[in-house]
């Protein structure tokens, strides 16, 4: 059993976390657009946090090293902190999903404010099992490289990109929904 922790809900690692969507028609009124933009802005997310809900504000948090972690991941846990954001992808693709595109801006701004734009971030990609050995590791690395490319557009110079393949799943792989949750990229900072 996994207890709900804010960091796991924010990163969507907690199994019961769900996204809240704002749908606007193409000809939306300016007030509706303004509300949707404000809700996703730093000021709007500050209100979300103030009211006791889990916001999309990026935070760095330590992760206790565990003996069963892969060696590279355990080293990160010992020396770096994990950001409260996971990048996820469109189904069957290495293209970032709509939330991840906004998260690129949030992460870049967090790193800018923390003075960590240059060679302080590590991207760790994960995936679901594949029949061909090494394919999961390759695909997870390609996803992490896609995130690096987007972060670079916002001035972030990533220190390292790695793919962990199907290690450390956050959901079961027996259904497509679980496999989608496992296809993620974490951000760690020194």
Residue ranges and their predicted role:
Residues 1-102, 106-118, 124, 145, ...:
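Exported/periplasmic ABC-transporter solute-binding proteins
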Residues 112, 116-117, 126-190:
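Periplasmic OmpA-like peptidoglycan-binding domain that tethers envelope proteins to the cell wall
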């Amino acid at each position: 059993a996994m207890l709900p922790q804010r960091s796991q809900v924010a990163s969507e690692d907690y199994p019961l976390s769900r996204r809240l969507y704002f749908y606007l028609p193409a000809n939306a009124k300016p007030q509706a657009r303004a509300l949707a933009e404000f809700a996703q802005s730093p000021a709007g997310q500050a209100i979300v946090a103030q009211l006791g809900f889990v916001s999309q504000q990026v935070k760095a948090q330590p992760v206790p090293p565990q003996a069963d972690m892969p060696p590279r991941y355990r080293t990160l846990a010992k020396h770096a902190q994990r950001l409260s954001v996971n990048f996820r992808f469109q189904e069957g693709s290495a293209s970032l999903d709509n939330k991840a595109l906004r998260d690129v801006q949030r992460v870049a701004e967090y790193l800018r404010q923390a003075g960590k734009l240059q060679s302080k971030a590590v991207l760790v990609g994960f995936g679901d099992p594949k029949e061909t050995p090494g394919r999961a590791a390759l695909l997870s690395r390609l996803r992490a490289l896609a995130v690096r490319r987007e972060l670079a557009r916002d001035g972030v110079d990533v220190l390292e990109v790695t793919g962990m393949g199907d290690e450390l799943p956050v959901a079961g792989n027996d259904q497509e929904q679980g496999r989608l949750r496992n296809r993620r990229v974490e951000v760690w900072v020194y």
